[in-house]
Amino acid sequence: MDWFHCNQCFRKDGAHFFVTSCGHIFCKKCMTLEKCAVCGNLCKHLALSDNLKPQEKKFFKSPVETALQCFSHISQVWCFQKKQTDLLIAFYKDRITKLEAAVKEAQEMAASQNKELSALRKENGELKKILDILKGSPSCYYGSRLTTPRPVGITSPSQSVAPRPSSHHSSQVVSRSSSMESIPYTVAGMGHVEQGSRGLHVRSTPGDSYTETPSPASTHSLSYRPSSASSGQGVSFRPFFSGDSGHTRVLTPNNSGRRESRTTPESLPGFQLPVLQTFYQQRQMGLARKDGWNISR
């Protein structure tokens, strides 16, 4: 220690030195018991030896050594604190990672639920519209049942209806088939055509044919003229006595439906006006036909 010396005589060598409470060092020769020789203050003194306490020895050690010891202690303290800090940071990092994963999962779930909610709202709106429509007109829900086509029973083509004489000078023999496009029919007319007492017996099989039967209350005698072709031609008939004597009704069957048109009698080929007959002539002709029928049988 280069700095160690007596503050009174400035000696460096010697075996006994004393230090006062006021911070002065004296050798054994310069030491006074009551007052400090330098500052003159009352003080206590302590003999320097190897038995000093640690807090007293540190004042006589080298500052570099003291600094190294302090730095070593500081380094240990710093390493310990840094280790604890690293553990705490690692814990927070792991917790942040878990929280980020939980937040991401929650965001995905929220997006999925929002999409599902939008779909449910859309479906709910459509169902509300349908419900409003059904509340407004409940018959539309069952309307399709009213328009359902019903099956029609049709007899076999082999079955036929036998001809029978009619009280109004007309009879019909109808042979039905399973399709409207293959219905043959025979019309036996008892009308009086061209001043003769002949019965007109017509049989034709158009693609879509049908027969008209005069009502019992009618006084018409119908004469049917089938066309030569199987389809697309008209079947005309005309009344002989009363009613619509000025026109001839032309019935034209086809595959798609029935058409009915009216033409003037003069436009038809071979048109002849009906001949009015008296009740006596009609009766005589009816008896003649009846006799002819019996003979033919």
Swiss-Prot record:
Residues 206-234 have a biased composition (Polar residues). It catalyses: S-ubiquitinyl-[E2 ubiquitin-conjugating enzyme]-L-cysteine + [acceptor protein]-L-lysine = [E2 ubiquitin-conjugating enzyme]-L-cysteine + N(6)-ubiquitinyl-[acceptor protein]-L-lysine. Disruption phenotype: Homozygous mutant mice are apparently healthy. Both male and female are infertile and show synapsis defects specifically between the sex chromosomes. Most of the metaphase I/diakinesis from mutant spermatocytes display univalents with only a fraction forming chiasmata. Similarly, pachytene oocytes from Rnf212b-/- females lack MLH1 foci and metaphase I chromosomes have no chiasmata between homologous chromosome pairs. InterPro entries: Zip3/RNF212-like (IPR042123), Znf_RING_CS (IPR017907). GO terms for molecular function: SUMO transferase activity; ubiquitin protein ligase activity; zinc ion binding. Pathway: Protein modification; protein ubiquitination. Its main location: nucleus. Autoubiquitinated. One of its GO terms (biological process) is protein ubiquitination. Ubiquitin E3 ligase that acts as a crucial factor for crossing-over (CO) formation during meiosis. Essential for normal prophase I progression and for ensuring appropriate CO designation in meiosis. Recruits key components of the cross-over machinery either directly ou indirectly, leading to the activation of the MutL-gamma complex. The function of RNF212B in CO designation is dependent on its catalytic activity. This is E3 ubiquitin-protein ligase RNF212B. It comes from Mus musculus.
